[in-house]
Amino acid sequence: MKNQKIKNFLLWFLSDIMFLFSSASALSVRWARQNYPMQSFRNVYFVLSSDTSGHDSGTFFSALKGFLIPSLVIYIVYRIVLFILKKKNINLSAYIFAKLNALYMIAVVLLSVILLKAWNYPLFARKVNGKPVSSEFYKENYTDPFEVKIIAPQIKRNLILIFMESMESSYATVKDGGVFLEDIIPNLSRTAKENVNFSADSLIGGGHNLEGTSWTGAGLISKLTGVPYFNPFITENGNVYCLRRALSLGDVLKSQGYNLVFSMGSEKQFENRDAFLEGHGFDVHDIVWYKEHGFISKYYRVFWGFEDLKLYEAAKTELTELAKSSSPFCYGMLTVDTHFPYGYKCPLCKDDFSHPMMNVLRCADSQVNEFINWCKAQSWFSNTTIAIMGDHCYLNAPENNFIDECSPLSKKQINERRRFFNLIINPSSKINIDMQKNRDFSSFDMFPTVLECLGNQIEGGRLALGQSLLSKNPTLIEKYGEKKVNKEIMKRSVEYEQLR
């Protein structure tokens, strides 16, 4: 009798664990598909395999609300129902319930695997960690920047690099090259028309979101070095390094005597961004740095760290100081308010649209426009070039895609127009900007393009996998097509490994 009670207790305990686990798992899959780009398994794999400390502070509360608390509520209701049935003397078999909950758990696990296409992760991990092979693609198309003659201009121009989180050219109107009836980013659209904007046609446009370039860490690496993110980090003696044998925009400008600063409102170690940026010439100012130097309160934290409103104010102060030096400067910025899935609504944001992300984008457009106007009013602006780029396209979740929901175009038409935003303001007068339209390009091409916009002369116009868009020479996408390039850059190659 005693043994039977112990057995029943253990069966009920196991049954409850399986029920709670299954409910939480089912709801967590739904939550993940509403908040993360689970269809982009390569992105998810690479981000999770890097340093994820410093993540969005709202993720935990979102998880609480999205599946932890609801699953607990479901479990409590489940136990109440069992209690009522027991009070009514309805026989409840622990063994039968354990079997039912085991079937429930198996069904949830199988459904989760199917919905998340989870088999892709071990397959891709095997590919990433497999034996590297020699790549004919790299041999034919990679131009070693260390062997390219780069002639700096006699008078070096300052550079302000603004990487805007998830900024796309598709946020413009349909008639201007975007996908919406109303322009979400009217200021950036107007400024793009008035300045240099590289595009696949005569309208406002941008670059292809290739594999290995389509999330923040990958966007920064690919735009600054001309190579993709394919497990670029290596750890030696406890230190993390990133593409030590690749030349970056920061390395080139550092060698030309520039002062380099890169600012962000989040923590620099997320995705090992510090290893990349600091390893290639930049002094990184992140939320920790700004707290230590009194820019923000020690205990202040919202969203990923602090909002863009404060970042732009800090940038104005830092640019004013950098401009006092006799050396040219390169000041990089990474905004964050427009991060998926819904962005961060600061005090400046208005409710112009039904979707919160669209309101945050409109607010970001207004803030960067005010910052551009401030720069134009400074004494140093005449010798300063501003390059604005989306770090990547918006990472929509399978069950949360405001672009598809709010655009009048078909899904196919939308996908054809989705490109990361690019804008060059006040480039060197010595360059030829006639080639800015009817170009198919990617993040790789921004490295040599930005350098030439500063007045540098690049022999052949090629650096790494990038081709300057100021040249008539074809980019990789123009030469091979997007599908072929994606296939080749997602192979583990000996040539890429040699850059680590």
PLM features: what roles do these ranges have?
Residues 1-130:
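Transmembrane and membrane-interface helices of multi-pass
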Residues 37-40, 133-134, 138, 248, ...:
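A diffuse structural propensity rather than consistent per-protein peaks
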Residues 38, 42, 101, 118-121, ...:
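Generic intrinsically disordered, low-complexity segments enriched for polar/acidic and small residues
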Residues 44-45, 124, 134, 138, ...:
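Generic structural signal of hydrophobic/aromatic residues within well-ordered alpha-helices
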Residues 129-146:
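Short extracytoplasmic/periplasmic juxtamembrane "stem" segments immediately C-terminal to an N-terminal membrane anchor
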Residues 144-500:
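Solvent-exposed soluble domains appended to multi-pass membrane proteins
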